[in-house]
């Protein structure tokens, strides 16, 4: 019998790094509404009283960077200085340039199917049958806890909650199967006048218990709610935030490998983002078809080259056919060239702000979660 623990974390939409991700993707969406051929690499930095937006953007669109930034922060819930950040009074600074023509000549082609990758890179996708979402349980439930915190805050059910929060869930496995939840950590920013006793009871009763399945909670499950005892100072006042610093939260919670490339603020010509979505799409369809219980796929690209340089698949000894046979199937069914995967997944649309919080994967509203290749794979 082989028992082990595995832990994943998530953060709320009010976490500083997630504020940055959302601003970058909000700007990307507004640009794509006007210009589907735009090249966008938008980075955001937030700290007390200020937002700095930089990067490279080449587009025919005009967007009001300041207005979009303030609206995004306001929608998150930072509407006055009491929470440590104010959408209406913070400074918004812009240092945006254009995409290098050296890069552009490797991407744009007269024949779009020959569109080259926007950069070199290694990309991973993953799926598992351990949850209904074909996602690992630790990251799934860490996200659900954060979504519940946001829901209760925005509906004023727990009006003393503030936007910044973090969760961490540790599952116990036996031979790859979940047997229990070992530990739950949840820290949430709050108003100053709330007692710790009341906060802990409310978080347990209103956030944790409604989200986590009873079948995995035992008398030995440990709960740590605001373990420092106080979380009043949060958001950008507590820590600076930068686009792309929560890449494990954005993907599989550490259950799968990661190529290192972040997602937010990048248009689909950047394979860091678009090929990661395609890799998830491939892995999920393989698992849903019954060809494997778990599947990880690696793709690699070279700048300016259309075809992937390599494809690797690992099914962790759960595959019904060999990994090499799976790779052959993938090559015949999925178009993994940059333009091919953009078209396959309909990525040229303004859907990216929604991806910037609570994970890019395991959410049915996104096209890379479709299971429309299951029959072809079966």
Curated annotation (Swiss-Prot):
Residues 99-109 are annotated as: Flexible loop. It comes from Buchnera aphidicola subsp. Acyrthosiphon pisum (strain APS) (Acyrthosiphon pisum symbiotic bacterium). This is S-adenosylmethionine synthase. Belongs to the AdoMet synthase family. K(+) binds at residue 43. ATP binds at residues 15, 164-166, 230-231, 239, 245-246, 262, 266. Its cofactor is Mg(2+); K(+). Pathway: Amino-acid biosynthesis; S-adenosyl-L-methionine biosynthesis; S-adenosyl-L-methionine from L-methionine: step 1/1. Homotetramer; dimer of dimers. L-methionine binds at residues 56, 99, 239, 270. Its EC number is 2.5.1.6. HAMAP family: S_AdoMet_synth1 (MF_00086). Catalyzes the formation of S-adenosylmethionine (AdoMet) from methionine and ATP. The overall synthetic reaction is composed of two sequential steps, AdoMet formation and the subsequent tripolyphosphate hydrolysis which occurs prior to release of AdoMet from the enzyme. One of its GO terms (cellular component) is cytoplasm. Keywords: ATP-binding, Cytoplasm, Magnesium, Metal-binding, Nucleotide-binding, One-carbon metabolism, Potassium, Transferase. It comes from the Bacteria.
């Amino acid at each position: 019998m082989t028992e082990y623990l595995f832990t994943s974390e998530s953060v709320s939409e009010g976490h500083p790094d997630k504020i940055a991700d959302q601003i970058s993707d909000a700007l990307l969406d507004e640009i794509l509404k006007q210009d589907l051929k735009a090249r966008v690499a938008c980075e955001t930095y937030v700290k007390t009283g200020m937002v700095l937006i930089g990067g490279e953007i080449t587009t025919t669109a005009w967007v009001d960077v300041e207005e979009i930034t303030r609206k995004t922060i306001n929608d998150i819930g930072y509407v006055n200085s009491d929470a440590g950040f104010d959408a209406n009074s913070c400074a918004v600074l812009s240092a945006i340039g254009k995409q290098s023509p050296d890069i552009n000549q490797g991407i744009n082609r007269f024949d779009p199917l020959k569109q080259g990758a926007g950069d070199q890179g290694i990309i991973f996708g993953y799926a598992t049958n351990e949850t209904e979402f074909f996602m690992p349980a630790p990251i799934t439930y860490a996200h659900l806890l954060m979504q519940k915190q946001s829901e209760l805050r925005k509906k004023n059910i727990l009006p003393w909650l503030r936007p910044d929060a973090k969760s961490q869930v540790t599952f116990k496995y036996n031979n790859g199967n979940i047997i229990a939840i070992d530990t739950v950590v949840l820290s949430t920013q709050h108003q100053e006048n709330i007692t710790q006793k009341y906060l802990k009871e409310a978080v347990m009763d209103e956030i944790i218990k409604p989200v986590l399945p009873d079948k995995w909670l035992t008398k030995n499950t440990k709960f740590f709610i605001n373990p420092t005892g106080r979380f009043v100072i949060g958001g950008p006042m507590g820590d600076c935030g930068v686009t792309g610093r929560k890449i494990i939260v954005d993907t599989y919670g550490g259950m799968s490998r990661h190529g290192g490339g972040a997602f937010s603020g990048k248009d689909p010509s950047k394979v860091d983002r678009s090929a990661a979505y395609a890799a998830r799409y491939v892995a999920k369809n393989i698992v849903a078809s019954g060809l494997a219980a778990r599947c990880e796929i690696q793709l690699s690209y070279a700048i300016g080259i259309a075809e992937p340089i390599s494809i690797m698949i690992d099914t962790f000894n759960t595959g019904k056919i060999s990994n090499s046979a799976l790779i052959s199937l993938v090559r015949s069914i999925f178009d993994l060239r940059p333009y091919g995967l953009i078209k396959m997944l309909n990525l040229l649309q303004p859907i990216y702000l929604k991806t910037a919080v609570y994970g890019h994967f395991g959410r049915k509203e996104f096209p890379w979660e479709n299971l429309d290749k299951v029959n072809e794979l079966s």
